[in-house]
Design a protein with these regions (language model features):
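Glycine- and charge-enriched loop/helix tracts that form the active or gating conduit
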Residues: 1-117, 121, 125, 129-143, ...
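Divalent metal-dependent catalytic cores for phosphoryl transfer on phosphate-bearing substrates
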Residues: 112-221
Length: 222
């Protein structure tokens, strides 16, 4: 069980990053969190805005690699720096293709990423965030998310800058988000389009296919 030494409020006011570390220990070690610690984190969540983004992203990466599902419990804590997660949690998907909200679909998709790759993990984390902005509901109550990949790609550019990711990641993450929902067929014409039109080498084409696989595995069985 994750506990604080002494008063949790005092510990988190000394260094707000400790709130993220508590979740990281839960993710890496499989521990549960003491209720007083969880309550204190919820109370002091706004303090995270005073922590440098580099320190926050370092902890975020550790959680993404070990157990991304923990992020579902961190939306309030991350809200000052990554409000998009909370919006995704609140974005339901009443569709034959989905069984859960945008955030839980995203985290489920990330769990299929084997072996782990940091760039692809961020691409998966960002891939459906555009749905929040484009969601519509038809007369039958079914939800639609037209052009979410394009909107999400633009949003991912901003997130890459906000999180100070590498130049290589800033180049490829928005590309993967933009094309994650493309209609793809395993024929020469389709492969030619990606290899020539988008100048993809084998590595990046396989990366895109891996993202599509993870996304597909986190969909409903039709």
């Amino acid at each position: 069980v994750i506990r604080c030494v002494g008063n949790p409020d005092r510990r988190f006011n000394e260094d707000a990053l400790r709130m993220l570390r508590a979740y990281r220990f839960c993710a890496k070690l499989g521990f549960s969190m003491d209720e007083t610690v969880k309550t204190s984190i919820d109370t002091n969540a706004s303090l995270i805005q005073y922590v440098s983004i580099e320190r926050i992203v370092h902890e975020l990466k550790e959680i993404m690699e070990t157990n991304p599902q923990v992020l579902a419990d961190m939306t309030l804590l991350l809200k000052p720096v990554f409000n998009e997660l909370d919006l995704a949690l609140r974005c339901s998907q009443n569709s034959i293709y989905h069984y859960t909200d945008v955030l839980h679909h995203t985290l489920d998709a990330m769990c299929y990423l084997k072996p782990y790759d940091e760039t692809l993990a961020f691409a998966l984390l960002f891939h459906d965030l555009g749905k929040v902005q484009v969601k519509t509901t038809d007369s039958n109550g079914k939800d639609h998310f037209k052009h979410h990949a394009k909107v999400g790609s633009e949003l991912s550019k901003e997130l890459c800058r906000r999180f100070k990711l590498t130049n290589e990641q800033r180049k490829w993450i928005p590309f993967y988000v933009l094309h994650h929902d493309d209609k793809f067929t395993c024929d020469l014409d389709c492969i030619y389009k990606y290899r020539v039109t988008y100048h993809l080498d084998e590595e990046h084409l396989l990366n895109l296919l891996q993202i599509r696989y993870c996304d597909a595995m986190a969909h409903s069985e039709l």
